[in-house]
Amino acid sequence: MKHPGLSIINILTVLTVLTSCSCNQDRQNNWGIPDKEQELPGSETAVPEEIAYDCTVTVDASSFVSEDYIGNGVQWDPYEVNDISDTDWQKLYNRLDFMKPQFIRMMHNIGEKTVNGALIKEAGLEHLMHLLDYCQSRGITVMFGDWGGSIADPEKGTINETLLRNIAEYLDFLINTKGYDCIKYYNLINEPNGYWSQTKGDYDLWSHAVKFFWEEARKLGLDKKIKMAAPDVAIWTAEETFWVSNTVRDFPEATGIYDIHTYPSKITVNSGQYTDIIKAYKDASAPGSKIVMGEIGFKYQEPEDAGYHAENLKRAANLAHASTEDSQMFVYDYMYGTDMADAVFQTINAGYSGCVAWMLDDAMHYKEPGKLKIWGFWNIFGDERYGAEHETVRPWFYAWSLLCRYIPKGTDFYTVNVSGTDGIKAIAGVHDGKRTIAVVNVSKEEKTVKITSDNLGNMDNVRKYIYGEGLFVTEGDCTMHPVATDMDFSLSKGEILKLPAESMILLTEL
């Protein structure tokens, strides 16, 4: 598969665009790339006021859809395959330092640390400490959890009390002995509503396990250090909100955040139907509480996306180490970055407080012997085992990085209204008085967008980023440059921007 990204061809493509743009006296775009001392001509943002626009993005700074946002981040689990070299660990850290994830979900299996009922605390600890040390040193909020293997027996309707005690003891070890107070939330049993889960969709069995575990955690004083993240269900429709409402009823003190997982189809998100689905779960959560997207990714299951589904299977079948059952092969395409942005924007505007992308690295999980789940931003064992091209950062890393590093923990999001055309979504937030606005165009056509606000005020010293194929330049292994800096915006008058097809623009004072 041809791999897009950091090639000289990509850079030359951008320079060609810049050259053609500099000749256009009407300044039809603003794709200039600044160097260390000055910006190249053509890096201005707004197109002339007289140019017609397709839609209006209106920001209401007097109204908020989500406050004190936890942040966006990634699923980062202890690696199941091979040992990682010091060089690769440093590469992982450097890439994450550019992304700046605010929120990480991290899962394990307590059964792998239990021998004849006894907890072996050091089992697998070396790998896990690499992850937790990083999160602790960067102040990242961690949602830790157990996949659920052997914790419950759905045939007998029983729970494994030994394993549940060991989970509480292991958490006590990590938090109180090892000092990992970055762990703020705990997930018990991944996606308990699913037929693939250890509880096979039995709410009563899951709640029995949670009650027993939480009592064991309380005995150790852990209730003062962590809260539950629940119910952690995977949903595709609005028909399973009872999992959230029952959690509100049964675990009002134990639950710190509500969480769900979504793997929507492209048409579901791009059409806006996704908002209606996820809003139902927000509405089912406790008033004043937070709810997060504990996993988010795309699966092309709707009839309208049959072409994407077929292409996904074809690509997986043509890659020797890819699982055809559980891979998202469009992570190699720029489109996946804009689709993920679309989903996140709708999630934020529906009142959620965080999103965790599935997943960081292909190398974390086998689906079957010799077959990996291809979902990540890269495969850190590419050079050693799978081919150097797979270790290279994939395009959607840059889109997701913008939505992590420029949406820091504690961001408040304003109400945003988009009118005039389909395919455009937007968010607007503020952190410590500094504003960020992002707009995504998921359509196959260029769109002209007017951004306006009666009460947001002017934006000063703005950096502008644009994500899309051929629209930005990277440096080194993973650094993305803004296309312009030190810009000013008068939103009371309105600013008009052009968004190429399948692109995202982010404007930030941060």
Model-based region annotation:
Residues M228-A230, F242, T255-H261:
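Catalytic cores of carbohydrate-active enzymes
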Residues C23-Y185, G194-Y195, K200-T237, R249-A254, ...:
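Non-catalytic accessory regions flanking glycosidase/transglycosidase catalytic cores in CAZymes
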Residues S327-M335, W378-E391:
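Active-site rim elements
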Residues S265-G370, L403:
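Catalytic-core region of carbohydrate-active enzymes that cleave or remodel glycosidic bonds
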Residues M1-I9:
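Bacterial N-terminal signal peptides that target proteins for export
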Residues N10-S20:
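Bacterial N-terminal signal peptides
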Residues W196, Y258, P264:
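Acidic/histidine-rich catalytic cores of soluble enzymes
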Residues I189-E191:
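Active-site neighborhood of divalent metal-dependent phosphoester/pyrophosphate hydrolases
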